[in-house]
Amino acid sequence: IMTRDKFFETIDKKVGLENREQIEWAYALAKQFHREQMRDEGVRYFEHCRDVALVLIKYGPTNPDELIVGLLHDIYEDQFVPRGMIKQLFGNEVNEALKTLSHEKPFYKRHGKIVKTSESKKEYFDLIRQSSVLVRRVKLADRLHNVLTLEFCKPEKRIRKIKETREYVLPIARETDMRFFKAIKNRCDYWDRKDHGK
């Protein structure tokens, strides 16, 4: 079982101590903001956030900002985050990366009101494809972890996710990092054989 201590031992060994405090903040924030969410496989949603950071380490080299974005990649989409908080804690690059990765973007109105707007799937993935390597790598780590854990979701959701992955994510992976491309494609092929006998 991956505990907090083991996670940070891995960080110290593979990434070093640079910005360690900020990574700890991101870890705590992800745990707090996602505390009531569960995944299809019956585990805390936070486990997915932590696993995305571990995938980024495995497919390194990585850096503190990338790990922070990995830990917090769903924070704007799933939660209502106070205006300016992420930018204040982690800087503008991390904040903008998190907004790009969110399918539902926060729009801050007066008196603390937050409205969420979303774009089409194609617009969303086009934006990611044109973004920084950091944004693309976090999306690829997120999707790789998702396709590795698809046995716990309903077949129709799985088939939809694999189709979306082939259409939108694999082209990004091919342009970004062939290791991600091969790992994600292998898992898509596995599920196609399982679900369609291909």
Map each language-model feature to its residues.
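Active-site helical microenvironments for divalent-metal-assisted chemistry
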Residues: 1-198
